[in-house]
């Protein structure tokens, strides 16, 4: 006895349409992908090549001096490089942690019903939409020791002026500026998460006797974890790449207390004019950022995949 299995014509038609749709998407995407490959790929290849040379702007023809991995080993042996790594890590960890905490606080407040909530939301967006260069200039004026607004206010209250950009507090002052500008980003992401929370679940928990703190701890916070991770991943990458504000506020000083990796790369390229070493620093910087942000991104996509299945 023979059992024959036939595939319904509808299923075959569905698969055929799916293949056609996928191939159409691929063909329409290929021109843009090719342009992106040229625009991004070619400079990356050239920069990696130059990181293997002894190219210096003060030595004609040095862009052809192939020296292998010498730039990388010199950078990794440099105490200035590791000092920049330390400053970058402190800057990133403290700034992103404060932005996350304040973002959660402001998002919870903005999720409540109160008079003027729309105005407050609009005002919160202002720091985020200002370009970093303008933010750096604006806060440098506020931080001026003799004529700055902050020290003027302290003087009217009877306090001594604070050297905001001095050796001891310069990094903290730079962190304050980044927190001021980037907390709204965290707030918007987390507010979107709060507004997607199932109200029926919250109402059921409250009906069972859960207080506000318990609802936040066991329902709201776990629901917000993916949103916090998205915001944290973007902000870690953003903080690592931050240059404008730091350069305009402190030039990386006093000394090297605010010299992050981006400022260190700039100083090497545009003060020492060592392009080969600068490109090596840039590639090390890329690996450094990926090593920190990749676990967050991987966990985020892994959680999304688990939730989908």
Swiss-Prot record:
Output one GO BP term.
Answer: transmembrane transport
GO CC annotation: plasma membrane
Topology versus the membrane, per the UniProt entry? Answer: Multi-pass membrane protein
Which residue ranges traverse the bilayer?
Answer: 25-45, 89-109, 123-143, 174-194, 221-241, 246-266, 278-298
SUPFAM superfamilies linked: MetI-like
State its role: Probably part of the binding-protein-dependent transport system y4oPQRS. This system probably transports a sugar-like molecule. Probably responsible for the translocation of the substrate across the membrane.
For this entry, the protein name equals Probable ABC transporter permease protein y4oQ
